[in-house]
């Protein structure tokens, strides 16, 4: 069930916020992106099963659509995040759409263009369901995620649009994750899991409220 947490928009935004970067690429490391990411260990079996089921469904569909299109992760997610592909319309002049059409035409044993589009739309639907399941696991159902295409300010200006949660939801989620990180850290200190000599937690590493610098002060700025 941890897979659903780590594939969620919550974790993606957390990793971009607190992970280190090289140019505009994230350096995804356990210490910066996983060890600091707060996941409750006291989830009910019902919630764990829900997370496991949606995580498996998402993983399996992604694997099958990639195999059917004969595309790797990067190109698949380029399509996933392309606002030229929606349930209402397809912009057949968009470079991602044109590239997909040409690829499917020249590559043997692939699915049709329409099937590929439906597969991408289904992947988005599953991602929304996974985010909602993670939201429920945290008990933050007062937050409206409002999935759609939004600009994210940690990417280059010419490539900022992503299919993700609303900027207001992102800001609130990051705020609560930071608070939860601190709460878990304090609980670990009380349980003797904090190594004072090394000043790091043996389980969940604490992260501080960000000041000016990479990512900006997300909690006090409109995004």
Say what each PLM segment does.
Residues 1-223:
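S-adenosyl-L-methionine
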